[in-house]
């Protein structure tokens, strides 16, 4: 049996990339981060390869699927949302912490279209991104719970309701930016926050989505963005 015929040993560490391969990988990730920021997660991979100065074949050798590229690019980006949630929990007044979290989340989405897309989607094969998002959702639950226990945030608001805030903000941002009103989200958020206050609460006409329904919706959006038909 030749060396080439021997089965690979999964316990052995992967060989480090050659210098040129590492340079290409870093260039692809940097280009993808900028293209996704500007155009969202459905941006053409050909444009990423062009900006990275590599051929599309090189891109696919490094990242055989869009999801693998997303996983490499987005984990650090999504971490910014985790830091916002941690800062929100450090604010003394629970309502101020809740409002801070929503405002900074919308601000991040306005600055980075790809990040906005990622926060409204689930990618079952992007382990690094999903691990960060799971940590984020734990922190956001604490932000909401703290504000509700203080009596300032309406008691019937759920985490699933907040998913709609993210979806709505992400989808409308490109249109209002093109219309010359990139900060229009601030007015919309102020109206939403007024509706979230406990003292202004009225009975809601429809039950919230269940966690399972929101998860399924986010998976559907993630599959569409990643071009995954399965």
Where are these regions (language model features)?
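Short linear capping/connector segments at secondary-structure termini
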Residues: 117-126, 207-209
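Amphipathic alpha-helical packing segments from all-alpha helical-bundle domains
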Residues: 125-175, 182-187
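Short hydrophobic/aromatic patch on the recognition helix
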Residues: 53-63
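Amphipathic alpha-helical interaction segments
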Residues: 27, 47, 96-104, 161-165, ...
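Hydrophobic alpha-helical connector segments
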Residues: 72, 79, 83-111, 124-139
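C-terminal peripheral helix-coil segments that are non-catalytic and often amphipathic
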Residues: 1-12, 138-149, 175-230
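Basic, helix-initiating cap at the start of DNA-binding domains
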Residues: 1-50, 68-71
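Helix-turn-helix/winged-helix DNA-binding modules
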Residues: 40-41, 61, 154
């Amino acid at each position: 049996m030749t060396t080439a015929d021997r089965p690979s040993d999964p316990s052995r560490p992967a060989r480090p990339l050659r210098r040129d391969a590492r340079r290409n990988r870093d260039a692809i990730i940097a280009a993808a981060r900028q293209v996704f920021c500007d155009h969202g997660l459905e941006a053409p991979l050909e444009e990423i390869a062009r900006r990275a100065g590599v051929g599309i074949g090189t891109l696919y050798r490094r990242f055989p699927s869009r999801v693998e590229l997303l996983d490499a690019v987005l984990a650090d980006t999504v971490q910014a949302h985790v830091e916002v949630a941690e800062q929100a929990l450090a604010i003394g007044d629970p309502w101020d912490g809740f409002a801070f979290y929503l405002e900074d989340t919308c601000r991040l989405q306005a600055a980075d279209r790809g990040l906005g897309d990622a926060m409204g989607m689930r990618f079952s094969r992007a382990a690094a991104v999903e691990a960060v998002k799971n940590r984020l959702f734990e922190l956001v639950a604490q932000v909401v719970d703290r504000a509700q226990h203080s009596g300032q945030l309406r008691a019937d608001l759920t985490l699933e309701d907040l998913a709609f805030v993210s979806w709505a903000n992400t989808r409308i941002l490109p249109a209002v930016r093109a219309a010359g009103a990139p900060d229009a989200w601030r007015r919309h958020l102020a109206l939403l926050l007024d509706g979230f206050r406990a003292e202004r609460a009225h009975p809601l006409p429809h039950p919230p989505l269940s966690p399972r329904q929101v998860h399924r919706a986010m998976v559907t959006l993630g599959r569409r963005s990643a071009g995954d038909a399965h």
